[in-house]
């Protein structure tokens, strides 16, 4: 469950290390973001020489959440951290690598490029 002011790890090589959620996109009453939701975020920690700088406002897709959630088959899944991947136009990732596992729900939400770059899909 990601809401405004939540800080997330960035799981790609764009140079951002940590972002803070500003808004969960998808209507005026959307309160929480789940895996596969797009958020608007601010870069809080960045490495020098990266694509993004501290203070940049970016769009990102949530790939892992620490809060468990149920799947249609009755199973539950949760991750150790809250993580996101920065995206650009046409919802393609801005980085060329993705670190750590991603949730299977991204495939259903048509983030195929992220799924193909990920080392593991759970």
Curated annotation (Swiss-Prot):
PROSITE patterns: RIBOSOMAL_L14 (PS00049). GO terms for molecular function: large ribosomal subunit rRNA binding; structural constituent of ribosome. GO terms for biological process: translation. The keyword Nucleotide-binding does not apply. Keywords: Ribonucleoprotein, Ribosomal protein, RNA-binding, rRNA-binding. It holds the Pfam family Ribosomal_L14. GO terms for cellular component: cytosolic large ribosomal subunit. The keyword Coiled coil does not apply. InterPro entries: Ribosomal_uL14, Ribosomal_uL14_bac-type, Ribosomal_uL14_CS, Ribosomal_uL14_sf. Gene3D superfamilies: Ribosomal protein L14. Belongs to the universal ribosomal protein uL14 family. Binds to 23S rRNA. Forms part of two intersubunit bridges in the 70S ribosome. Part of the 50S ribosomal subunit. Forms a cluster with proteins L3 and L19. In the 70S ribosome, L14 and L19 interact and together make contacts with the 16S rRNA in bridges B5 and B8. This is Large ribosomal subunit protein uL14. The gene is rplN.
């Amino acid at each position: 469950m990601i809401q405004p002011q939540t800080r997330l790890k960035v799981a790609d090589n764009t140079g951002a290390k940590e972002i803070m959620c500003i808004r969960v996109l998808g209507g005026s009453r959307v309160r929480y973001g789940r895996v596969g939701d797009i958020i608007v975020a601010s870069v809080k920690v960045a490495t020098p020489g990266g694509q993004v700088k501290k203070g940049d406002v970016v769009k990102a897709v949530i790939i892992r959440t620490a809060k468990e959630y149920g799947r249609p088959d009755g199973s539950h899944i949760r991750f150790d951290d809250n993580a996101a991947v920065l995206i650009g136009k046409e919802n393609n990732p801005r980085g060329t690598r993705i670190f750590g596992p991603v949730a299977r729900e991204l495939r259903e939400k048509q983030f195929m490029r992220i799924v193909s770059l990920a080392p593991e899909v759970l």
